[in-house]
Structures are given as structure tokens and as C-alpha cells.
């Protein structure tokens, strides 16, 4: 029989284990399931103070980005950006880490498939958020389309044609200020847009707006379209709709439309002639053989 002291010790040890377990899961499970190292699972620095953005500042940051994008006179597919609170929440969390650097790709958003980009700035002076946005944009002086140049990554992210959503956050850490913007989608390429006349790939959704220098520019306005396309769907910037494939349908390609038999004949042959089932890891095979791969029930 355990003594009272042993019992208390056992309970204490159990409590420590349980608390430790909870600590590892202190963030929302949707982020933890992406990666336990997700930005939303980090602990804020003790000296970090959140500096909430006003709606006016959010609007100014968004408007400034769209003006910068409208300044690009040879982009055929430049999307208009809109504000996204999901991205802003993660950006704010990273700002609370007080680090002049990026969060190593741990900023993904479960509701937005694909990569999320990020721009970060730091100042111990009187730099404002709009000043940080302009500082990133000033990298254009070293930008050359199709040629990667160090020191232009912030500008490239600002004018990545496929970046349709932005969310930002800021913090104060002692005498230092940190500014963070997250973008969906992100890019690291040296060709951030397709060359051509502005809006030439989106004539049905084209909107003319004034750029940062007061000149008129054009952006593909799909802000009323779906947030993203899932399950391999392709976003059509002319119609502002997802083009789904295989068994997937609906506005964002998340509705499953199961067939009575697999689309690919090879998936319906006797077992000995079937394609190897481990091929189901590939997206095109999942679309061709949804029953064989277990995405749809076998009606037989």
C-alpha cells in the first residue's frame, strides 16, 4: 500500500505530466495539426506588447499594396488584394516574437491551401507601418524580371500576381517596433507575374485603379470569388471561379461527386492487372481512381 507521501508524490507527478501535455497543445488544434512548431503555437516574448492596427490603418496598408501592384505596367494577371483576418492573426503572433526574421514557413493557414508569404520590418526609430510597406516597395530599384537579386524579396512578394489576400500585425518590444505582413499566396520566384498588357488575362474581372504615383493602373478584381481552390482546383482569374477536376466540385472544389466506377480503365481491371495502389499518393491518380484509392465508396 502506498504511503500518503507516495500518493501525493504520484499525484503531483501525474499533474506535471498532464500540464506538460497541455502545454504542448496550448494553441488551436487546427494549427498544431499542421505542425507543432506553428507560429500560433509559440509563446510571446515577455516584453512584447501588441499594438493593434486600427481599421483605418488596415485599409491604408491594403490600399497601398494595391496601388503598388497597379504600378506594374507589364503584368497580365495581377490580382487585387483584400484583407484577411486569418492571416492578420498569425502575422500578429509572429510580431509578438520580437524577431527580425521570418518564421521558416510555419505560418500556414488551414483554410487556405498552399504557401503563405511574409514580409517583416523592424525599427528603433519613428518608422510607421506605411513606412515599412514603402521600404519594401523601394526594393524595385534592384528588381529585374526573371533575374533573382538579393534584397528584392519583399517587393517580389508585394507584386506576386497570385497574392490575393493580406493580413498584418505589429508589436513593440522595448524600444523596438516590429511590422509583419502575411500574404496568400506566397512566392520565392523571380517571375512574380506573367508579362503582358495589364488585365489581358482577366478582361471580365478587370478594375482600373490609381497607382501610387497617381497614374491609372489595372488589377484583376476577384474579391467576390472563393477564398481558395481546394483538391487541385485551378483558379480562373477571368471568371473568378475555381475550375475543379476529378470527383471535386462546388465553388471551392470541396464538394465530392463520386462516380459509379473509376474514370481510368486500368483501375477497374482484375486485381492482377491493376495499377499499384501505392500510386494513390499522387494527385492525378487520386482523381482517376477515386474508388480504388478509397476516396469514394465502391457501389458494387
UniProtKB/Swiss-Prot annotation:
SMART domains in UniProt: SCP
Top-level lineage group: Eukaryota
Expression by tissue: Expressed by the venom duct.
EC number: 3.4.-.-
SCP domain sequence ranges: 62-183
Role of this protein: Protease responsible for cleaving the conotoxins from their propeptide precursors. The target propeptide requires minimum four residues including a leucine N-terminal of the cleavage site for efficient substrate processing (example: Xaa-Xaa-Xaa-Leu-Asn-Lys-Arg-toxin).
Protein name as annotated: Cysteine-rich venom protein
Amino acid at each position: 500500500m502506498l504511503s500518503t507521501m507516495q500518493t501525493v508524490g504520484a499525484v503531483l507527478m501525474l499533474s506535471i505530466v498532464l500540464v506538460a501535455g497541455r502545454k504542448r497543445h496550448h494553441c488551436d488544434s487546427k494549427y498544431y495539426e499542421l505542425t507543432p512548431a506553428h507560429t500560433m503555437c509559440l509563446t510571446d516574448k515577455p516584453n512584447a506588447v501588441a499594438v493593434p492596427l486600427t481599421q483605418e490603418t488596415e485599409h491604408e496598408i491594403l490600399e497601398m499594396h494595391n496601388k503598388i501592384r497597379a504600378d506594374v505596367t507589364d503584368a497580365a494577371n495581377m490580382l487585387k488584394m483584400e484583407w484577411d483576418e486569418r492571416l492578420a492573426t498569425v502575422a500578429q503572433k509572429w510580431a509578438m516574437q520580437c524577431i527580425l526574421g521570418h518564421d521558416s514557413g510555419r505560418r500556414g493557414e488551414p483554410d487556405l491551401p498552399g504557401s503563405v508569404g511574409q514580409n517583416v520590418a523592424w525599427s528603433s526609430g519613428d518608422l510607421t507601418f506605411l513606412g515599412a510597406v514603402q521600404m519594401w516597395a523601394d526594393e524595385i530599384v534592384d528588381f529585374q524580371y526573371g533575374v533573382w537579386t538579393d534584397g528584392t524579396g519583399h517587393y517580389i512578394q508585394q507584386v506576386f500576381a497570385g497574392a490575393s489576400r493580406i493580413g498584418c500585425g505589429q508589436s513593440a518590444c522595448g524600444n523596438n517596433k516590429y511590422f509583419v505582413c502575411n500574404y496568400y499566396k506566397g512566392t520565392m520566384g523571380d517571375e512574380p507575374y506573367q508579362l503582358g498588357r495589364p488585365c489581358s488575362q482577366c478582361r471580365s474581372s478587370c478594375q482600373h485603379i490609381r497607382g501610387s504615383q497617381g497614374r491609372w493602373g489595372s488589377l484583376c478584381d476577384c474579391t467576390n470569388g472563393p477564398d481558395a481552390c481546394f483538391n487541385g482546383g485551378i483558379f480562373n482569374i477571368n471568371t473568378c471561379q475555381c475550375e475543379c477536376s476529378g470527383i471535386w466540385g462546388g465553388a471551392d472544389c470541396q464538394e465530392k461527386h463520386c462516380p459509379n466506377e473509376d474514370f481510368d480503365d486500368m483501375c477497374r481491371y482484375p486485381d492482377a492487372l491493376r495499377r499499384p495502389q501505392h500510386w494513390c499518393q499522387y494527385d492525378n491518380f487520386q482523381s482517376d481512381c477515386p474508388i480504388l484509392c478509397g476516396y469514394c465508396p465502391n457501389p458494387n
